[in-house]
Structures are given as C-alpha cells and as structure tokens.
C-alpha cells in the first residue's frame, strides 16, 4: 500500500478531514485508538475543558462504559485557543491549517479568505451533529474563538461561513480589550504610630 509521513497525515486530517488519517496518527502516536483517546482526555482536562470526552480520534459517534463521545462549543473554543496561541506546537499547527493546499490535499476551510485576521479553523460533520466549525481570529491585538455546532445539514453546507462572520463581527463590534485598575487593600498595621496605605495593582484583561 501507499506510505505517508506523519506530516502528510496531519495535512490530510486538518485540510481534508480524512478519518483514516486520524486513525493512523492515533495508532502511530499512542499505539492504539483507545490509548490515544486517553491522551486526548488528559490534555482536554489540562487546558480547562469541563464537558469533553473523547473516544474516537476522528470525532465519529461512539459510546463505551464510561460515556459517549462528546464536547461543547465552549470546550472547542478552549481547544482552538490552545492550539493557536498556547501550544508549544502552535507554529506547526498554524502552518498546516493555513495552507490552502498541500500535495493532493486541498483545504476545505474557505473562511480563511473571507475575513481579515482569520488564523485557523476546522470543519466537521456527522449525521447527528450536522455541519460544525471552530475558528480563531485576531485583529488589533484582540483574540477571538468561535464554535458552531449543528450549523445546517446537507444542502446547507455553506451556512457556517455566514454564521462565523456574524459571530466574529459581533465580537469585534461589541467587546474591547481594557486595562482595569483594581484597588486592593492589603492590610492596615500600626507600626510606631504609622498606618500602611492601600496598595493598587493593574490588571490587563481581555473582555470576551
């Protein structure tokens, strides 16, 4: 049979959503799909996911004695944010997911060219979940992630692009990065007739 490198499998997975690429990667990295799912679940908890349980490496429906394969829009946003901005492999992730094509693989993420600042995105589909999409965008130092679930079924494959633009547009128009000054009283202590004063601290926050 034909042989592929791990790099080629990653492009096949992220650009074309090939399920067999996901399985091959899982078996190569962890030895089995089950062991790989365990790694995924541990990583999901590590980055703050609250309601995610992986069974399959490709996202297809599955169930076992511990539950069913599932996640939430919030957790998907956390995963995308980690991949784009926090992961030690973020540069490689962006290189792959931003490629319009690689060899025989063509990127199905048309949204990359539909809005300024789009950094990455991943499409998905199952009969139960419908068309799904998760993406990351950065403009003027502001960072946003969105997740669309059940965003249409066959014959409505392009709904997700319009909805993604609407959500990102809302975020850009509504929220802003603010510098918040927080007054914090540490403690009052009498020392030789002197009283300590309240201290102030500056916290930079992104309001999203």
Label every model-predicted segment.
Residues 4-11, 23, 27, 34, ...:
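Solvent-exposed, polar/charged alpha-helical surfaces in well-ordered, non-transmembrane soluble domains
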Residues 27-81, 85:
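Mid-domain, small-residue-enriched loop/turn segments at the edges of structured enzyme/sensor domains
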Residues 1, 7-12, 22-31, 60-68, ...:
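Second-shell loop/turn segments in exported
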């Amino acid at each position: 049979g034909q042989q592929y490198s791990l790099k080629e499998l990653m492009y096949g997975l992220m650009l074309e959503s090939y399920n067999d690429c996901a399985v091959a990667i899982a078996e190569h990295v962890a030895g089995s799909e089950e062991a790989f799912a365990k790694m995924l679940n541990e990583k999901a908890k590590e980055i703050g996911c609250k309601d995610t349980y992986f069974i399959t490496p490709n996202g297809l429906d599955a169930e076992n004695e511990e539950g069913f394969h599932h996640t939430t829009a919030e957790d998907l946003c956390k995963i995308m944010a980690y991949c784009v901005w926090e992961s030690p492999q973020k540069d490689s992730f962006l290189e792959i997911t931003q490629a319009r094509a690689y060899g025989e693989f063509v990127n199905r993420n048309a949204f990359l060219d539909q809005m300024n600042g789009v950094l990455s995105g991943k499409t998905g589909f199952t009969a139960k979940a419908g068309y799904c999409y998760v993406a990351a965008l950065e403009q003027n130092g502001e960072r946003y992630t969105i997740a669309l679930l059940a965003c249409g079924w066959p014959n409505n494959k392009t709904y997700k692009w319009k909805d993604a633009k609407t959500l990102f547009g809302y975020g850009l128009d509504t929220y802003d990065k603010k510098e918040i000054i927080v007054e914090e009283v540490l403690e009052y202590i009498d020392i030789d007739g002197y009283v300590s004063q309240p201290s102030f601290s500056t916290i930079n926050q992104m309001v999203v």
